[in-house]
Design a protein with these regions (language model features):
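A structural signal for multi-pass alpha-helical bundles of membrane permease subunits
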Residues: 31-300
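Short, Lys/Arg-rich, polar N-terminal cytosolic tail immediately upstream
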Residues: 1-27
Length: 300
């Protein structure tokens, strides 16, 4: 049975329809403004990388041109072959050194931070919160603050052994962040899950590796990415400790493209593009897990 509309309900209905129509008109406009703003932000952050790539394919004359042109007169793709045989910088060995140090420091951090984060998350020992606060405070220290002490401690390490020193240093400086973020993920897993595994006969280590670690995999990936990138970009400790050019990582070796009499900016930017390719590949492979780790880690 339908209820007839009264004389007073018709204006109300018309007003409601007018309001809905106005909202529908405003929604596309607001969405367009949001998309434009997001696009401008993306362009703002991508512009340095675009400029770096464009400079990497310029000729020496284009780089030295005054006033400079943003676009090259011709694409000098041969720069990507020339840098591998440039006499002042051994890009291949420097790239190998960077990879060895970054991978070694990341594995070291995982080996130490995983059980430490699990213990902090699962056991309420005296001084737990001060310990976490102290761990977080160590993030304020940088290798430049301890440059003199690091040099005195590791200056006698010669040859490729100096890579081990850089692995230890970078591992130590990234350990606190890994413990902090991984303990948050371990804390998000209910204790009842571990208790059930212990009741089924698993030991504590078996429970951590077989039960807890698969559940906090996004957090582990997040820690791995941050530690790897921080080590890949590290400059201060490598600059202080590594004196031989053939052992220097890319961050220390690249400035040698800018010599006293010749400044090969195009080769330096070419090497910069080569240096970020491994990081881009890693992001492409683990993008979904990284985003999942960054989002799920904020919810218990």
């Amino acid at each position: 049975m339908s209820i007839p509309l009264t004389k007073h309900s018709e204006p109300a209905k018309a007003a409601s329809e007018a309001t809905s129509a106005t909202r529908r008109k405003r929604r596309p406009a607001g969405m367009v403004m949001t998309l434009v703003g997001a696009l401008l932000i993306v362009l703002f952050f991508l512009f340095p990388y675009a400029l770096m790539f464009v400079t990497s394919v310029k000729t020496r004359g284009d780089v030295r041109k005054i006033p400079p042109d943003y676009l090259p007169s011709k694409l000098e793709l041969s720069n990507y072959l020339t840098v591998w045989s440039f006499p002042a910088v051994n890009v291949g060995k420097s790239l190998l050194a960077t990879a060895v140090i970054a991978i070694g420091a990341t594995l070291l951090v995982l080996l130490v931070a995983t059980p430490a984060a699990y213990y902090v998350a699962r056991f309420r020992f005296p001084g737990r919160m001060p310990f976490l606060f102290l761990v977080l405070c160590t993030q304020m220290l940088q290798p430049t603050v301890l440059a003199v002490g690091l040099y005195q401690e590791f200056s006698s390490w010669q040859g490729q052994v100096v890579w081990v020193a850089l692995i230890l240093i970078n591992g130590a400086f990234n350990l606190s962040f890994a413990i902090w973020i991984m303990q948050a993920f371990f804390s998000s897993v209910p204790k009842e899950v571990d208790e059930a595994a212990l009741m089924d006969g698993l030991g504590r280590l078996q429970t951590m590796f077989k039960i807890s670690l698969p559940l906090v995999w996004p957090g582990i990936v997040t820690a791995v990415v941050f530690v790897f990138i921080n080590t890949w970009n590290e400059y201060a400790a490598a600059f202080v400790l590594v004196q031989k050019p053939e052992l220097q990582p890319l961050t220390v070796a690249m400035p040698r493209f800018l010599g006293l009499y010749v400044r090969e900016w195009q080769y330096m930017f070419t090497t910069s593009v080569i240096a970020i390719v491994p990081v881009i590949i890693m992001f492409a492979l683990i993008e979904k897990r990284l985003i999942g780790g960054l989002t799920s880690g904020s919810i218990k």
